């Protein structure tokens, strides 16, 4: 279990080690190293998802490790409350950023090993704190430099606890 201690409350997450082993290992490594401490949910879209894991307050981007293989063909779906890896348009480009689905997002699911079909790898789910996620999804957002949908007031992951 992983707990994000945010300035809006705690979000408790259960990982799917058996379905996305490389992705879960990558995520837990970042958690244990303290990478996510004092990072923000930098992209919040009500009716879609909340994204974090890559920026500090002030939209300062963090350096990451090498990208990992996309394990989206694991049978898991991007349903409300699941966590998936964020990435660029390249299927195997995920590093540290993740998002929490606030609705079912079927269009993000794996449909085939093509550029459009790879989808986004689900690797965990919220088991407690969806009320916190729902609070976050409703914050006021705007533009920050080249970025859209950025909370006007920082939504901060203050610290992360990993319990085996």
Swiss-Prot record:
Question: Which superkingdom, per the lineage?
Answer: Bacteria
User: Which EC number applies?
Assistant: 5.2.1.8
Domain named PPIase cyclophilin-type is located at 1-162
Identify the Pfam families for this entry.
Pro_isomerase
* GO cellular component, as recorded: cytosol
Looking up InterPro entries in the UniProt record yields:
Cyclophilin-like_dom_sf, Cyclophilin-type_PPIase, Cyclophilin-type_PPIase_CS, Cyclophilin-type_PPIase_dom, E_coli_cyclophilin_A-like
Does this UniProt record's set of keywords contain Flavoprotein?
no
Task: Describe the reaction catalysed, as an equation.
Answer: [protein]-peptidylproline (omega=180) = [protein]-peptidylproline (omega=0)
Subcellular locations according to the entry = Cytoplasm
Task: Describe how its activity is regulated.
Answer: Inhibition by cyclosporin A with a Ki of 25 to 50 mu-mol, a concentration 1000-fold higher than that required for eukaryotic PPIases.
Molecular function as annotated in GO: peptidyl-prolyl cis-trans isomerase activity
> Which GO terms are recorded in the biological process aspect for this UniProt protein?
chaperone-mediated protein folding
Family matches, as CDD domains: cyclophilin_EcCYP_like
| Keywords from the named record | Cytoplasm, Isomerase, Rotamase
Give the intrachain disulfide bonds.
Answer: none
Keyword Isomerase in the entry? The reply is yes
Q: Show the NCBIfam families listed in the entry.
A: PRK10791.1 (NF008057)
What is the documented function of this protein?
A: PPIases accelerate the folding of proteins. It catalyzes the cis-trans isomerization of proline imidic peptide bonds in oligopeptides.
Which family, according to UniProt? Belongs to the cyclophilin-type PPIase family.
Give the protein name, as stated in the record.
Peptidyl-prolyl cis-trans isomerase B
Species whose genome carries this gene: Escherichia coli (strain K12)
Starting at the broadest rank, the lineage of the source organism is: Bacteria, Pseudomonadati, Pseudomonadota, Gammaproteobacteria, Enterobacterales
Query: Which gene is the coding source of this polypeptide chain?
Result: ppiB
